[in-house]
Amino acid sequence: MNATTALVPSVFDLNTTSRRALAVALGAGFVALLAQVALPLPFTPVPVTLQTLGVLLAGAALGSRLGAQALLLYLAAGAAGLPVFAGGGAGVGWLAGPTGGYLLGFVAAAWLAGALVERFAADRRPLPAFLAMLAAGAAIYAFGLAGLAGWMALAGKTVSLPGLLALGFWPFALGDLLKAGLAAVLLPAAWKGLGRSGRI
């Protein structure tokens, strides 16, 4: 074994191309599974879901490159018609809808979570991992709020910044804070399953 392989026994490792491809597929599937836990809110087109937990954990566990690939696969599957988006949604129209920015932000967030964890939390310290998850979550909001504002503008609706935050940030902030903490707690177990020490 070398420095990039498991420090502990693993379910499978990432030492071959086929296993990395499997890990990418599992990461995409994990996000798709959590996306089915969705709670629509009456005052916003953005639902509450668990998929952000999957995005953060997949990115941090797989690493920046494989994590981003997993989320690209997830988006491709949904755009192709598989019911993997929130609540079983599917179709390319989702990428142009009110939640399209959030979906596109998943790729950036997975990459950022992986990159930051590899750089600052490879020693398994929970606080740096938690901060990395928060930064990755901020990337989702940056893309998501921009996409939501663009969608509303195209629909002929005007919204102020406070109004935009009321639709696309504040209802989800506490839950996403908790999901970031949970992802940081679960990360060592995910690394163990993948046979990772913190870096690929």
State the predicted function of each range.
Residues 33, 37, 61, 87-88, ...:
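Helix-loop junctions at the membrane-solvent interface of multi-pass transporters
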Residues 61-65, 112-120, 189-194:
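Structural signal for the C-terminal ends of transmembrane alpha-helices
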Residues 16-24, 48-55, 67, 98, ...:
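Residue-level signature of transmembrane alpha-helical entry/exit and packing/kink sites
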Residues 1-70:
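Hydrophobic transmembrane alpha-helices
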Residues 23-34, 55, 59, 70-78, ...:
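Alpha-helical transmembrane segments in multi-pass membrane proteins
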Residues 36-47, 75-109:
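Interfacial aromatic-anchored transmembrane helix boundaries in multi-pass membrane proteins
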